[in-house]
């Protein structure tokens, strides 16, 4: 039986729109699994008894292995991290124990051990698990720098209380930096440091982070990320990326933008930008293939139309 990838933690115990899920990095295919009810178009409600099946598989293993906690790829999945972690869906439950204990050895288990500070072990649905910050560091060894940044942006993102029921980010920049300082010799830490240097607080989704990084690596100017921008008196928009000097806005549009009501809102948004003399660059999943080559070209053309040129 194929186990569905766990939803982001913020979506596991409440109804949500498909756009909220897509913005959180959930795939369209994941939204079709039978563990999600659809009481109305574009609405999903988790069937909690099924949604927690993965945690229920992990919990007994940690219970019979003293001083252990879910970690590495298993914690990555349980926390619902975005980003590509090679091997994350391979068989085997990852658990860790302190250095002083033996490495866990049990059929179906991938054992680890390491140094753990008290605040690096927490609980998830009654299951002992490495904290989000520690999980981020543990998984950095296998990830590339940009994908580590995708996870860092997810942890640093300021949530929307009206939709997510929380007002604080999962982690602060200081907390992630402290995690690196504590474990300065651990494998992958150099990549994690480089990733944290290019992380930002404002990115709302994994595709937005990948787009921002692709534009950076292409040598385009640095954009403001999800900053409210007054287009004209009384008209404020919050583009995913804004080049205020060139009056160019960039929006990444997930599949939820095909909804008829969303199309109407998108047209109104584009009209606002046009009336204010801004260029709105709309990016979709199709533009992100081949290292976002098409997306970079679209943004570059818009900037050049406004007089920007490479130095």
PLM feature segments, named:
Residues 1-188, 305, 309-311:
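Short gly/ser-rich loop at a beta-strand->alpha-helix junction or flexible surface loop bordering the NTP-binding
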Residues 9, 20, 25, 159-311:
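Surface segments flanking catalytic/ligand-binding clefts of nucleic-acid enzymes
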């Amino acid at each position: 039986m194929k186990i569905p990838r766990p939803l982001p933690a913020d979506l596991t115990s409440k109804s949500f729109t498909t756009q909220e899920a897509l913005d959180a990095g959930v795939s369209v295919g994941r939204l079709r699994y039978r563990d999600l009810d659809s009481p109305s178009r574009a609405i999903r409600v988790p069937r909690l008894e099924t949604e927690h099946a993965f945690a229920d598989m992990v919990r007994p293993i940690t219970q019979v292995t003293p001083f252990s906690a879910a970690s590495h790829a298993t914690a990555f999945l349980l926390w619902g991290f975005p980003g590509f972690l090679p091997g994350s869906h391979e068989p085997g439950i990852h658990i860790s124990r302190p250095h002083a204990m033996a490495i866990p050895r049990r059929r179906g288990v991938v054992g680890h051990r390491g140094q753990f500070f008290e605040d690096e072990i927490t609980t998830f649905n009654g299951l002992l698990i490495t904290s989000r910050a520690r999980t981020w560091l543990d998984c950095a060894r296998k990830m590339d720098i940009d994908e580590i940044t995708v996870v860092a942006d997810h942890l640093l993102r300021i949530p929307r209380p009206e939709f997510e029921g929380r007002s604080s980010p999962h982690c602060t920049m200081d907390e992630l930096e402290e995690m690196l300082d504590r474990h300065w010799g651990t494998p992958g830490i150099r990549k994690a440091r480089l990733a944290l240097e290019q992380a930002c607080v404002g990115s709302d989704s994994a595709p937005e982070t990948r787009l921002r990084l692709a534009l950076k690596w292409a040598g385009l100017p640095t954009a403001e990320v999800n900053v409210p921008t007054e287009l004209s008196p009384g008209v404020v928009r919050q583009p995913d990326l804004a080049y205020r000097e060139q009056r160019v806005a960039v929006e990444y549009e997930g599949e939820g933008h095909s909804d008829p009501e969303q199309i109407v809102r998108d047209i109104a948004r584009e009209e606002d930008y046009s009336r204010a003399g801004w260029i709105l660059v709309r990016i979709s999943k199709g533009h992100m293939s081949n290292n976002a080559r098409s997306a970079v070209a679209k943004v570059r053309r818009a900037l050049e139309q406004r007089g920007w040129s490479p130095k």
